Amino acid sequence: EIEALGQEITWENIGDPVRKGEVPPKWIREIVADLVDQADSWAYCDSQGVAEVREFLANEVNRRDGVRVSADDIIFFNGLGDAVAKVYGFLNREARILGPSPAYSTHSSAEAAHSGYGHVTYDLDPYNGWMPDVADIRKKIQYNDSIAGILLLTPDNPTGAVYPREIVEKIAAIAHEYDVFLIADEIYANIVYTGAGRLHMSEWIGGVPGIAMRGISKEFPWPGARCGWLEILNKDKDSNFAHYVDSLLAAKRLEVSSTTLPQMSIPRIMGDPRYPEHLDARSKQFSRRADEMSGVFAGCEHIIANKPEGAFYYTIIFEDGLLDDSRSLSIENPKIREAVERMTEGVEPDKRFVYYLMGATGIVVVPLSGFQCAHHGFRATLLETDDKKRAWIQKSLRDAIDEYVASSR
């Protein structure tokens, strides 16, 4: 509606690097083009995934220190959205998964839909770099015996936080103590630009049963491929967990197969000697953009703007209690101003800011209240490839924050 009224829109709400202008390297596109000419890339594959690809991915896991897997521990899906729906949908009805807050909506909505209740969460602490509150995790599990598993996203969406080994090992120890399994959404595992480096679930989970969620959408990047997989860890450690995993595979077999061509590309692309260089170059690129973002918001009063260390996003929160319905941004176009005033009636305080931001600047970000979070703020991305436009986006956000905070004084 705002766009129809004449405001040019800048989309900062979706993590699609290709849509934001990133072009996958030519050598990756050439591999995919070559595979299109192979007849078997047009056929169904095994329901669990192409056998050779699963063998390749199992070997990749086994190159690390930690849990060993086989090709039978890899299950392909049509993107992680498909995998997430199955992972939550085939739990026992009364079983709950404890997830982080801010909560990525794909997980939180699927878990809530499965259980019929609101998603149960533990806190990520914005005053400590968005690290998980381990004491809160323990408390939530200790007093809720319906919790069957703990979810982590690392690197995290929406905060960009990357959890150090000491934190995830503490969470694994709690899972072991209370006999629950772990889920790690690792779709951004190779997009890390902190000095700590990349850390994979198989390296820190120990003997706890777990599921690592992986895919190619963010790191090739090829979001349109809809190709993701689960790495099943320590299936043999718990019979209930083994039965649950078998139910996931049985459900997958009813769908015949997942997309064949993207699977077939994985060994050729990930096994190419240019791939590590590709990952490192992208990490350095996002590191530079994170530095830019951190510099723009440094010294900005009334907010917390933690510098991201992985993934594509950063999250900014306002001081608790700061936002209210007396604040606004100046909007020159009267029709847009009228539309925004109508849209903001009775909405969450951060959603009000987001609507005014869209009306005033055309920039679309995601309110943090949409991530089942008690803090008010928003998520934006580091994906804009045009340096001047990215600088404009970040400066516009900073200016909008300053104006909005001052508007009711």
Give residue spans per PLM region.
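Active-site phosphate-binding strand-loop segment of PLP-dependent enzymes
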Residues: 124-198
